[in-house]
Regions:
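Metalloprotease/metallohydrolase-associated module, dominated by Zn2+-dependent proteases
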Residues: 1-48, 52, 69-150
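Active-site recognition of the HExxH zinc-binding catalytic motif
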Residues: 56-68
């Protein structure tokens, strides 16, 4: 475990929405190991409300750095050693939703019930529908106030 203290930890790019952590090789020509890896974390994890979840994400990335690359049965057994892992999954989904909300530039709005799904991409087909009420979805740009409008 002493090897883990030598692993470089930095931030993910600002545009990361669904990724909360990433373990990469320092030297791509060599196999990933605790001596040849770097861990990147989403900056949002350093907000006080996400501190406990940040510890879990770091634990998850440390499992990768110890040679468990895929999310297979062995990886999940190690990850399940974390106390209250189910709660961490809930917090992770909340963080993803918050990041989506911040980055959203488009909203898919249901014409029948008014349900809204915010999206960062404009990709849209006219035949999309809301699975709950079967209303047709419309793609609407989100207009954010500029700094001059404040």
């Amino acid at each position: 475990l002493l090897q883990l203290s030598d692993i470089e930890v930095s931030f993910l790019s600002r545009n990361s929405i669904s990724r909360h952590g990433l373990t990469t090789n320092l030297d791509k020509s060599k196999k990933l190991s605790s001596s040849n890896c770097k861990i990147k974390l989403n900056k949002k994890l350093f907000e006080e409300k996400y501190f406990l979840y940040a510890e879990f994400v770091l634990f998850h990335e440390y499992i990768h750095s110890l040679g468990n690359f895929s999310h297979d049965k062995n990886f999940r057994q190690l990850e399940n050693l974390w106390p209250e892992k189910k709660q961490m999954n809930i917090i992770g989904r909340q963080l993803t939703r918050e990041l989506q909300e911040i980055k959203a530039q488009w909203a898919w709005t249901c014409s029948k019930c008014g349900f809204v799904v915010k999206r960062s991409s404009r990709k849209f087909r006219s035949n999309y529908f809301h699975k709950e009420c079967l209303g047709k979805l419309k793609n609407i740009p989100i207009i954010r106030p500029t700094s001059l409008e404040h």
